[in-house]
Amino acid sequence: MCSGGIMKIRYAKKSEKEIAIKFWKDSFKDSEEQIKFYFDNIYNEKNYLVLEDNSKIVSSLHENDYIFNFNNESIKSKYIVGVSSDIAMRNKGYMSKLLISMLENSKKKAMPFVFLTPINPKIYRKFGFEYFSNIEYYNFSIEELANFKLPNNEYSYLEINDKNKKLYLKDLIKVYNSNMEDKFCYLERDNFYFDKILKEAISDEMKIFILYKNKVASAYIIFGLYEENIEIRECLALNSISYKEILALIYGYRDYYKNVSLASPNNSNLEFLFENQLNIEKIVKPFMMLRILDPLAIFKNLKLENSNIKIYIEDKILKENTGLYS
């Protein structure tokens, strides 16, 4: 019970999409295009968890399905986004109840963990979330690319757009996987997921190119052009030579754009592609937070069964997790 009413947590009905859109608009600074993209391509009422008080939706969140590769094992998980409460109903504890319900729910569905990208990590630490990954940003003058050359042998740079994108999904996934196979954890991308990434980039008016050398997909880049800056959302290659060759494409914009900002997965160490590391500003920021729901599943995944480790866990929210694990 709360504010004299009856509270209920449930998944949304088909007819409640407009409510979801209004909550999003009231709570986040996304542009109309970004909101339209999300609700046209990603939103699913079956994953939209709402809290009702007196039959009125007062708080909500979205649980989007993802497959995580965690220590070489594919794990079904949920990426939590759009956690928000009615503007007039904030600070009444609705969001806490909703988040706790989501955690209990996900545990019942045998998920070892859920994850999110926080606007404010302090809020989510109260619920047992903690950072587990970083993202790297590299800022440099476009002139730093002056020595990056195009390939010498048979090659082509192909621009990917809405009409042809399906033709390149398999090759994009190959380049992505070759970069991820040595990582401890990463999001798995299938055709459906990669198609969504390309759709979002196209909706954000970004450009996408893939580099073929001797008919083999060797690198791809997703970037946007803004005033004096080029922002590279994602750039991956089979090796450092192909990485330089895809960045050589960016140098073609030097007459119009002065600076480049490049986002990259943790431990990319891209500064070593350049001749002078001191000219490259590298910023490492915490990226995603994770909440463990099933400690035993995680210990199994970490292959800790045979090691002589004893761990005591106190979980104030999922109390059944509290105990000594050995």
Region locations from a protein language model:
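Hydrophobic adenine-recognition pocket in adenosine-nucleotide-binding enzymes
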Residues: 83-85, 235
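Intrinsically disordered, low-complexity, positively biased terminal segments
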Residues: 2-3, 18, 154-326
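Short amphipathic alpha-helix that is part of the acyltransferase structural core
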Residues: 2-60, 64-65, 72-79, 146-191, ...
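Conserved active-site alpha-helix within GNAT-family acetyltransferase domains
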Residues: 108-112, 118-136, 267-283
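Conserved catalytic-core motifs of GNAT/GCN5-like acyltransferases
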Residues: 68, 117, 130-147
